[in-house]
Amino acid sequence: MSVPTVLEKIVARKFEEVAARRVQVSLAELEAAARAADAPRGFARALLEQAARKQPAVIAEIKKASPSKGVLRADFVPADIARSYEAGGATCLSVLTDIDFFQGADEYLQQARAACALPVIRKDFMVDPYQIVEARALGADCVLLIVSCLDDVRMAELAAVAKDVGLDVLVEVHDGNELERALNTLDTPLVGINNRNLHTFEVSLETTLDLLPRIPRERLVVTESGILNRADVELMEISEVYAFLVGEAFMRAESPGAELQRLFFPERGRPTVVGKDPE
């Protein structure tokens, strides 16, 4: 018997987590909370409009830890980070809500969204429609669907639920087979290419460049993971990739927003934004 990969462990734990949450809060209660939530802020629209101007459309990630790197940021205040990202030029936010592997929390999403005007994606491992409704109830504007976690029937089901509750969908792929499945199953304009292999956690920007020619022009490619310096950004922009999801490079910086500005908008001069506003 083979040893489960990190992704397989995460997905198995996610099914257990959803079962426990259903006992605490019914789907009907979540649906009521979703209907009462603030209106979605237009996650896909914000990215598409920014990328259409050939400007970096940055999804800035709020992530305390990861399975491969451990704690990324000890001084972790989601509201402060969200404000810093907004000042630094982010188009959208991504907030990790997975507890066991990324030290995330639902509250982090709520705190980040309340602190700024940016659209927010719930970054988690979605395996059940319950989680989609839960995301809208938390105030999320978009959800992530990871193709390697889902079969085509479940992927389509989750996307349909997302549409019903007013959420955009970012579908994430890592290889050609996953890309083909995503394009054939979903009509979302947002296609994320994860440069990190979720089974081994190895990273290569070639993943985006290899898959790029196979993606129709009407879809927006979001390159995810491995963007660490200006050379990485310029490599993508030369290939007409303008949407980015970046977390680690920002989380390790003293000021996440200043690092965002330095990496993506150097023409604005010396960054003045900070992680926490001085008194």
Swiss-Prot record:
Its EC number is 4.1.1.48. InterPro entries: Aldolase_TIM, Indole-3-glycerol_P_synth, Indole-3-glycerol_P_synth_dom, Indole-3-GlycerolPSynthase_CS, RibuloseP-bd_barrel. Keywords: Amino-acid biosynthesis, Aromatic amino acid biosynthesis, Decarboxylase, Lyase, Tryptophan biosynthesis. It comes from the Bacteria. The keyword Ribonucleoprotein does not apply. Signal peptide: none annotated. It catalyses: 1-(2-carboxyphenylamino)-1-deoxy-D-ribulose 5-phosphate + H(+) = (1S,2R)-1-C-(indol-3-yl)glycerol 3-phosphate + CO2 + H2O. GO terms for molecular function: indole-3-glycerol-phosphate synthase activity; phosphoribosylanthranilate isomerase activity. One of its GO terms (biological process) is L-tryptophan biosynthetic process. Pfam families: IGPS. Pathway: Amino-acid biosynthesis; L-tryptophan biosynthesis; L-tryptophan from chorismate: step 4/5. Belongs to the TrpC family. This is Indole-3-glycerol phosphate synthase. It comes from Ectopseudomonas mendocina (strain ymp) (Pseudomonas mendocina). The lineage of its organism: Bacteria, Pseudomonadati, Pseudomonadota, Gammaproteobacteria, Pseudomonadales.
